[in-house]
């Protein structure tokens, strides 16, 4: 079974990568992955904003039939009984991980990625959280992981993980850069699964 690494980047246009003709910006690592792997040349975003677009990708449902219809603070998420790309691959013997931005609605618990097929999750739980590269916390498999970063005082109310816009803010103390933590976690997941097929999203 082939390993699958699916990179979903918000606001990344078709022509932004070298492998699709970009001449000014250099994207050598992504270009190499595309050359060694598979390129999709006829694909549309499920929606114009991130949460429903991610829901459509993961569930395979048309935008009109997914429960996540927009970016909202309401606790609307993919339900645990809903089939997802991760749950199907998990059932086929894959080790599955979501590392980075979950951003599929606003869960009222932090196990939503794990509940819908991911063995492992480490990252931002919602879109507001993901707007800060130096958050005060991240989520790992349903648990809050405190970081050494600190947001400005005006954003302190949003650092309660149970707040609907949890994680929102601008850091004034910047010690741990979240994308670096995601890279480290991704590499560890790949190393741990050398002998198993894996799906890394």
PLM feature spans:
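Formylglycine-dependent sulfatase
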Residues: 1-201
């Amino acid at each position: 079974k082939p390993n699958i690494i699916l990179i979903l980047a918000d606001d990344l246009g078709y022509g932004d990568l070298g492998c699709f003709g970009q001449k000014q910006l250099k994207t050598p690592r992504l270009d190499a992955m595309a050359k060694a792997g598979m390129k999709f040349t006829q694909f549309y975003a499920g929606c114009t904003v991130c949460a429903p677009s991610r829901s459509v990708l993961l569930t395979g449902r048309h935008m009109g039939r997914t429960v996540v219809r927009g970016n909202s603070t309401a606790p609307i998420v993919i339900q645990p009984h809903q089939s997802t790309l991760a749950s199907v691959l998990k059932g086929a013997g894959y080790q599955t991980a979501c590392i980075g931005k979950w951003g599929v609605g606003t869960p009222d618990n932090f196990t939503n990625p794990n509940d819908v097929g991911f063995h492992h999750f480490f990252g931002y739980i919602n879109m507001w959280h993901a707007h800060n590269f130096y958050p005060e916390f991240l989520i790992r498999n349903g648990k809050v992981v405190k970081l050494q970063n600190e947001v400005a005082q005006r954003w302190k109310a949003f650092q309660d993980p149970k707040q609907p816009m949890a994680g929102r803010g601008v850091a004034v103390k910047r010690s741990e850069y979240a994308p670096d933590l995601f890279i480290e976690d991704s590499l560890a997941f790949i190393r741990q699964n050398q002998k198993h097929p894996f799906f890394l999203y």
